[in-house]
Curated annotation (Swiss-Prot):
UniProt-annotated location(s): Secreted
GO biological process: neuropeptide signaling pathway
Protein name as catalogued: CAPA-Periviscerokinin-1
Threonine amide modified-residue sites: 11
Organism: Pachyphasma brandbergense (Gladiator)
Family: Belongs to the periviscerokinin family.
């Protein structure tokens, strides 16, 4: 998810 990447970058 685009917004999710900014909030918590999943590795």
């Amino acid at each position: 998810e685009a917004a999710g990447l900014l909030a918590f970058p999943r590795t």
